From Swiss-Prot:
GO terms for biological process: miRNA processing; regulation of transcription by RNA polymerase II. GO terms for cellular component: mediator complex. Component of the Mediator complex. Residues 246-271 are annotated as: Disordered. The gene is MED17. GO terms for molecular function: transcription coregulator activity. Keywords: Nucleus, Transcription, Transcription regulation. The keyword Transcription applies. This is Mediator of RNA polymerase II transcription subunit 17. It comes from Arabidopsis thaliana (Mouse-ear cress). Its main location: nucleus.
Amino acid sequence: MDSDMEISLDRLPIKRLESIEENGAERFPSDVDYDDKRVSLIRRIDFAWALEEEDELKKKKQKKSSKDSVEQWKWKGMVENLQLAHQELTVIIDLIDTVQANDAVTVAGMTRPKPMPNEILSDLAVSTATKLQGYRNLGNYFKQSAKALEQKINREARFYGALIRLQRNWKVKRQRMLASNASNEGFTIDLSDSSLYDPTSGFRPSTLSTIRVDHDSAGMLAINVPQDSWYSLRFGYVGLNPIGNSNESDEHIDSTTGHDIPGTSEKLSASDDKYVKETHSLLREVHKSIFAEQLFDMLNREAFNEGVGFNISGLRENFMEMSIGQGASLFVSLHPSGKNPSIKKSESATLLIESSGRVEPAEGGDYRLKKLGFPNRTSYEIYLQQIFHEHAFGKAKDQLKSKSIRASNQTEKDSNSGLLDHFCLSLTHRIFSNRVLVHLESVVCKVPYLHLISHPTWNSRTSSWTVFMTVPPSIIPQGRSETQSPDGKRNLKTQFRTKVVVKDDCISVEAECTPNVVGLLKSSSCNLFSINKYECDVADLPVMILQQVASQIVCWLLEEARTVGTKASREFLSLSLEIVEGERVSLVAHVNPEDAKGCISWWLVMENGCTEEREGVSESRKLLGHLSLDVLYSVLMDLINLCGTGRNALERL
């Protein structure tokens, strides 16, 4: 070979045996790298002597500095600082002069000394801590932003959720011109319905027809209505009812929407439901107030027209008093329904006292109302609102439809009568009909075999009742009857009816078995089952009803007597049977509405020869008393047995 090859050999590391396992395998310690060796060597260096010397030097310097500081001049530090500043300023001035002289200025390169390991670790720790703090601040910012966004979404959800629920029942409009910021969404609730009004009616628009919807800080829908700005209609009888509403609750709905919102979601949901219900109730009150104002405005215009059923006796702001028939006076007023209506309420009460002068305490008012025949004021307050609703709202709807078949719409049929006049006539009729009903109930309650039925007339100025009586069945077999119709059936009635009809303040009675006047004057009986109709007044009504019932009983007994062939005749309220020639016995009815035991009593009277043979009038007349229909029928059968024809007929049965 031309050249020599040099081979360098390192010493083989001596590996000391660490352990020998049971199977003979040898385990050696792991190799240590260069850095670890250097670190272990550095750790072996003892710097304790250097630290001790350094500590001694520091202690000496501290002692010396403490001595010098006591003896130093107080301005020495400031002088040193000024000297250093002067040196630095001199260097800067020299550098500026050199640059201005265009001399070459060279900056010698400097190398940064290699940092120590502890400095690197310190810088890394500071950088990591700074970044960690920045991440924490960023996380907190994101959390706050997410929480604020969630609260905003919840507020929007609450607002629009409540608005959607209200939109189911109310007309919600959006005014885009008003939506200038997030707190005001520009929504309004329209409570008017101008499309249904008659253009010629002339209703004044209400200030409460449009209500602005706000968005409060809690995210809930808020409507602001001024206090004492809405009213409710009050109706009553002067001298019998107070002007205030006795059914009015002490708690009023707040016109603002400030509520404390609970924190939990369940309570929040419950409070939202309650809040929407309260808002709905408030809108209902405002809507009712608009309706009441329009109704009162219509009544004021109707009051200046001539009416048959009323006379205006007092007219003030939000108050009207009128006199109607049957000696009754009523008032209609607008009563404040806000949160503090005490002042206006006292003013209205004072006005009522001054206008009527007949205000009395309400104790025992229900009994007195019933006694005088006055109906429930709440029902007629509803009726007044109902006829106005039909006139104002129903009239516009019916223009495109056929006319309604309801008989209650009396105002369309009577073009000469206004709504107020029709209402007063209806109320007068109800007072009068209640008094008629009191008399009918008094008669029916005293006579056990009478019954009273009330018929609906579907007319506010017409009332109808029926007094009916069911008689016992006949004991005469059908085949042995002498009064039969062509089809073979007996003409016997089992029920008798008396119909009483009241129209306005006129009473008409229609009944069976009423003999006409001509037949009575001729002393002859008329058709037993003829139906006659006549009129009477309230004072004579009980007597007329009792006479009619007694006449029907006599008709029934007469028909039963003729069935067996007995000679019998009828003279108004008496039934006469001929015992023998020249002798007659009569069953006479006597009516007395004031008799609490039965109102109808019966007498047995002997006539002609019997009367002449007996001494004293008392022997020819005998009081039978108040008899039931079964007992009357038995008395009739006993009288028939006394008669020759009737006795023979009964023996052949």
